[in-house]
Amino acid sequence: MYENLLEPIELGPARIPNRIFNPPHGTTLGSEGVVTDNLIAYHEARARGGVGLIIVEGMAFHPSFEFESAYLNAGRDTIIPGLKKLARGCREHGTSVFGQLFHAGRAVRYTHDGSKPLIYSPSDIPDDRYRVVPRPMPNEMVWEVIDSYAKAAVRLAEADLDGVEILASMGYLIAQ
């Protein structure tokens, strides 16, 4: 029934050694937007266990969504050295590594200190879950965010990641 599970697969230029993957999820193991040794150890343990692809948790990349210091931030060059080290450590076990870019838009509850954040979305309609009223994004900001996606993807490539995933579901910015 699972005859392809341990077979390699190609995703664009990346060759994934098997069909077992670790999806992106918030670990809160980052600090001040950068990769920590704890985050590297967390992913290396999964790579040692035989995971074929790790998609590193959602990374912020634009100032309109930077509200939690435990989030990784691909909007700054400081992300590159830690991601390189993470990717190198996982590759030692044959695991490919992608990074996920993430902008919540209006789908935000509160900041780490419990205050309501200043958030932006295409309109001032609040999110159904969190009910925080966003500010409508000015047209210039829309173009800045688009440009920031591209710049962040370049940083992930400079960090030797094998691919980039853009989170476009769950009511986050692109889905708004």
What function would you assign to each model-found segment?
Residues M1-Q176:
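Flavin-dependent oxidoreductase catalytic cores
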